[in-house]
Amino acid sequence: MVTLDFSAMEAKWRDAWYEARINESEPEPGKKKFFMIFAYPGVTGYMHVGHMRGYSVTDAIVRYKMMTGHRVLFPVGTHATGNGAIGFARKVERGDPATIEQLKANGCTEETIRSLSDPMEVVKFFSQVYVNDYWKRFGFMSDWRRFTSTVNPDYSKFIEWQMRKLMSLGLLVQRPYFAPACVEHGPVAIDASETDISKGGGAEVLEYTL
């Protein structure tokens, strides 16, 4: 009976694809073009299988387009602005047991864990984890040279331009916005169950207008 080593097969062909650089895209006049991107993951910690399911769908589409004669551009990035990285850094800073244990279980040294009390270090650390430990391990056809993050200076300039453009067209309106928040963990909680994350949710909800 033949025994197949699927892990070895996976590594063999993944390495062959990247060595051949078939994932990299350059302009090619006259060839059909196709652009693909998935929603940047927030830099809030390690991913779960649900993330990879969605990303695998985009990769399947990209591969189909490549096989049907398209020049495909498939960049990736991380959503590092907002409260995600800040919230994670605060957990590390105050020594949240579950967060520290998760980092240790994933092989982080004490030095690395201490550094993750800085939100920018959280962004740098998990951006590398997402690319190297998840997306590349899955063999995605992303052009890794085109990785970006929403905290990169050039990306920030793009957002500034976008906001000014929308403002000039009268498409931005400032109004009161109501959202759940936690005075300990910071705004804005995704839903009421996250207003006391440290106790597993289900906290009492009090409404205020600030």
Question: Model features per residue range: what roles?
Answer:
Residues 1-210:
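N-terminal, positively charged nucleic-acid-binding surface of large information/translation enzymes
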